[in-house]
């Protein structure tokens, strides 16, 4: 049974401007393990990665029905790339839940969809 579906989209230029103004934004959005993956990329690919993770985390919060705030923060949600290249939500998956995530990019935006199944 589906618990929730979340979808989010973000402009890459907006993310780039935020990072240029406040580089700590990266640490507010990404976990330590995600930062290690982020650091492997160069140039615009870094912005795509960050924007994709931001959108995926927003989509997760929407699918979970909580949004971000008191009960959930960006670094509570971890999305790592598995060996075959797919993004995989590793935190905070609850027992009995399956979480499916898809992240996509264009030249101007990143979008993500999350489905939580129980």
From Swiss-Prot:
Any one GO biological process: fatty acid biosynthetic process
Domain of life: Bacteria
Transmembrane domains' residue ranges: none
MF terms in GO: holo-[acyl-carrier-protein] synthase activity; magnesium ion binding
Main localization, broad class: cytoplasm
GO cellular component: cytoplasm
Subcellular location: Cytoplasm
EC number(s) from the headed UniProt entry: 2.7.8.7
Keyword Transport tagged: no
Residues the entry annotates as binding Mg(2+): 8, 58
Keywords: Cytoplasm, Fatty acid biosynthesis, Fatty acid metabolism, Lipid biosynthesis, Lipid metabolism, Magnesium, Metal-binding, Transferase
Pfam family, one: ACPS
Cofactor(s) required for function per UniProt: Mg(2+)
Catalytic activity: apo-[ACP] + CoA = holo-[ACP] + adenosine 3',5'-bisphosphate + H(+)
Protein family per UniProt: Belongs to the P-Pant transferase superfamily. AcpS family.
Function noted in UniProt: Transfers the 4'-phosphopantetheine moiety from coenzyme A to a Ser of acyl-carrier-protein.
Record HAMAP family: AcpS
Protein name: Holo-[acyl-carrier-protein] synthase
Organism: Listeria monocytogenes serovar 1/2a (strain ATCC BAA-679 / EGD-e)
Taxonomic placement: Bacteria, Bacillati, Bacillota, Bacilli, Bacillales
Encoding gene (name): acpS
């Amino acid at each position: 049974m589906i618990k929730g579906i979340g979808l989010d989209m973000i402009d890459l230029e907006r993310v780039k401007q935020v990072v240029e103004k406040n580089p700590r934004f990266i640490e507010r959005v990404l976990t330590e393990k995600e930062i290690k993956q982020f650091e492997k990329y160069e140039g615009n690919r870094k912005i795509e990665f960050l924007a994709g993770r931001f959108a995926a985390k927003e989509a997760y919060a929407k699918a979970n029905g909580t949004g971000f705030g008191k009960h959930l923060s960006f670094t509570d949600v971890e999305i790592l790339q598995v060996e075959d290249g797919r993004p995989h939500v590793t935190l905070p998956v609850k027992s009995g839940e399956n979480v499916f995530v898809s992240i996509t990019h264009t030249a101007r935006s990143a979008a993500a969809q999350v489905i939580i199944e129980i």
